[in-house]
Amino acid sequence: MKLLSFLCSTLLLTTIAAQITTSQYDNQRTGATLTERTLTPQNVNPKTFGKLGAFKVDGAVYAQPLFLPALDIPGKGRHDVLFVATEHDSVYAFDADRPADPPLWHVSFLDQARGITTVPASDTQCPFIQPEVGITSTPVLDLKTGTLYALARAMAAHTLTLSLIHI
């Protein structure tokens, strides 16, 4: 199993209200959170900022994790949820405040019984992703419909296919 490590502030986890629903924080892909008020040069230092934990996932992570605070998960209650997509064609939902806990849910788009498997990295023109290529790009959360969209690569009957999928 691979571990997804993350860096964040204890203060950030307890007071964050920002949603991260797409790559680089917004549809313009600015990579900036211009309304950030919690993190400052004074509190982002080795004493108050650093790794808080690691989440177990089944493959490498290249996609930016997404975040929704105070999300109601049916049968599981309200959680600050971290969504993580892997190169093993999986999407996870974790309680962001409890990295040692199992995922709130996990979806795999592979189906060995139907011949749907991962794409070996050797079958692609992408040498820096190893050993398999699955969900590389950051998914998108559509808050209006409650849908997570992800683009997964998988092999079906030994043929490379690209599928637009949603959860």
Q: Which residue ranges define each predicted feature?
A:
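Sec-dependent signal peptide recognition
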Residues: K2-S9
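Sterically constrained small-residue positions within well-ordered secondary structures
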Residues: S9-L11, Q130
